Amino acid sequence: TLSEAWKRFIYHQFHDDLTGTSIPRAYEFSWNDELISLKQFSNVLTSSIRSIAGQMDTRVKGTPVILYNALGFPVQDIAEVEITLPSAPKGITVYDMNGKKVAAQLLNYADGKAQLLIDASVPATGYAVYDIRTSGSTNNPVDVANHTIENSIYKITLDENGDICSLLDKINHKELVKQGKVIRLALFTENESHPWPAWEIIKETIDREPISITGNVKISQIENGNLRKTLCIEKTHGESVFKQYIRLYEGSRAERIDFYNEVDWQSTNALLKAEFPLNVENREATYDLGIGSVKRGNNTDTAYEVYAHYWADLTHRDNSYGVSFLNDSKYGWDKPNDHTLRLTLLHTPGTTHNYAYQDRQDYGHHCFTYSLIGHSGALDHTSTVEKAELMNQRLKAFQTDKHKGTLGKEFSFVTSNNRNVIIKAIKKAESSDEYVIRVYETGGKSIQQATLSFAGDILSANEADGTEKNIGNATFNSNQLQIHIKPYSIQTFKVRLKKSMQPDYRSEYANLSLNYDRKCASFNEFRGEANFESGYSYAAELLPDSIFINQVPFHLGEKDSFNGMTCKGDTILLPSGNTYTRLYFLAASASDNDCAATFCCGKSKTELVIPSYTGFIGQWGHTNHTKGYLKDAEIAYVGTHRHSSGEDHPYEFTYMFKFGIHIPKGATSIILPKNDKIVLFAATLANENLPEVTAASRLFRTAIKGNHTGVPTDDNPNKENLLKTAEILSYSGYANPYEKPEYMIDGNKDTKWCDTGMTPNYVDFDLGKQQHISGWKLINAGEESHSYVTKGCFLQGKNHPDEEWKTLDRIDGNSRNKVERQLPQPAQARYIRLLVTNPVQDAEGKDARIYEFEVYK
């Protein structure tokens, strides 16, 4: 799974895709692939943590939480944790792996989960058990109008626009904001870029003076805790809405100021930057290159928008004081003068004829963070690298149960004794049982020596190149590897460790036979022999014989035979004398919609949502293009295409999903849901000797607005079909009285309009009055045969009977049974025409068959 997800992710690390210069349609596939990979990475991580958790001692008084540090150096930082609790706590108390009380802050309790902050310490590439207890009370007043916020290091003052007019370093008695200036979101309202709009920001744009965002400003303090205080600044510009959270911390993160932003961006011909006019001056700033750094001067005619990876820094010319800036997703900078750095956030160019669609580029909801750290003296490269790495690879939390374990309450796989030598990556070797360790030097000044200490003794060690070929011997003794590395260099080592003496917590699995009644897959030569849904089938040549997903094995049915079980309310008997405690199965919905389902086992009922076998797993939200969502289910299989009777359909993905249900003691059977759209592919019984582990922090970030993590299980009931009460004015014909045009607007998916006359086939409607129209939907006759799916048609409209029909949208080359579309541009129309030009997949066909036709506001 890990290799598959990684390859899918790096497919998109190329010129057009990564830089944002592909066409909008291409990003639908990019977003889907990225979200699939993020889900798979997270599932692999959780499964791996579960294996380690089983060997750790989690016996605590309260709720045990394992904190995981993926970085190659010890971390002290504030962990954001969300744990399940039966009721809202008045307060919380947290203890570390040594039983020492640590600072914590209760943020919120909702939907059975408590959100809190913990000032934590976790070893390099390691784990630590924390004890969370409910007790006492908390004092965190919120929603107070306030223009000032401070912690033990900084004091921040805002002006009436919500911009920072003063940022005082209280420890060093240093005002960070240039006199008469403000730290702000700076908006350039002229951002024309005609030849290469998405590619280029024009020098004339950033030479202009940007404006502050001053519309509908609201400032409030929403957090006032012992670990975090937060000001929320809300404002607007035109249709764009900005919400910025300025966060100050205590404890291990006290020296860092976070600016977390949520932006609904709807501004064309505009460029948004974060502007930092500082009370330090230097002709050169330092920019992170990922491995190493580079100094660059002020803007020139040819170098005015420059890149940096995780951080940039501006330190006064005498090295008396400086400011480092970290970020989690933005890479473009400019430096207009000696005292100002600006970070590029959003770029929507004004265009003319070339790439006209790019004038809506970046439209939608965005979430991003940048941070500021003041420092006395010269830039400490190593310290800044560590802080930037930590911002982008935060501590992750996992809730588990209480049990003993031989690893104790703290464990580290490998650590370096030299802060300048950071462990950048650890992986299994591609063709051996060795571990590959990659390190790099961060200080950039001198040759460094370091010792890497592993959790077990080293049997062999070699230096390797990037392709894992040995290039020399390495020095080691016991569990320690000796390293000599040049400034800003990278070194790779292959290490074979002595086999662990830890107990083997193997789980017991057994295949549960299913009564297959559905042929779900077809080979290229015989595509018409299977019909999973509407004439489509899985591509048999892609299917494996078995799937091993997060430690659970599944055995699939024969590829050229029945290999799916339709859920018809059947009862599956469990083996006699059953001692298994869990059933896992692979399933998908044979529909364009996700399906809700109830599985019954003994007295236990499990409610699940079974996603569609095809379509997208998720999308970013892009205004008037896509809506943001992400399906919850665990992905077990991804196919790159599907079959119909006549052809391959590339980029029409197919999926199987993994689900698990608890088997109560004494249960003898499992009752399946009664829904013939739900299909099971394999089932596995399990006795697992591992603890339950659930993620207790966000494992990855999205910009999906409102934390929407699913799609409707059926058609959206809030969408009103404007045709439902429309008058049918005329039509090309119908086959019989039971297949008249009105049957495709009656809301009944079992009735249809069928016209067997000559093409084009059409139906005209009168909505009764002019209506605003933004989208429409067709459900074709693919359930009868895939060849009956409408291949091409026009949606047309007009406002007066004597006007010519105007095309509002067009479908061409369609092969989907259900088509739901947003209009390229919203329209006003009273009269609607559906004009079918290619009623079937076969070019010779002439019969139109449409079950449902809907038009939406």
Outline where the language-model segments fall.
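C-terminal (or distal) subdomains of carbohydrate-active enzymes
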Residues: 50, 54-507
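Extracellular and analogous surface-interaction loops
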Residues: 68-71, 85, 249-251, 427-429, ...
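Extracellular beta-rich ligand/substrate-recognition surface
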Residues: 234-240, 348-350, 415-417, 444, ...
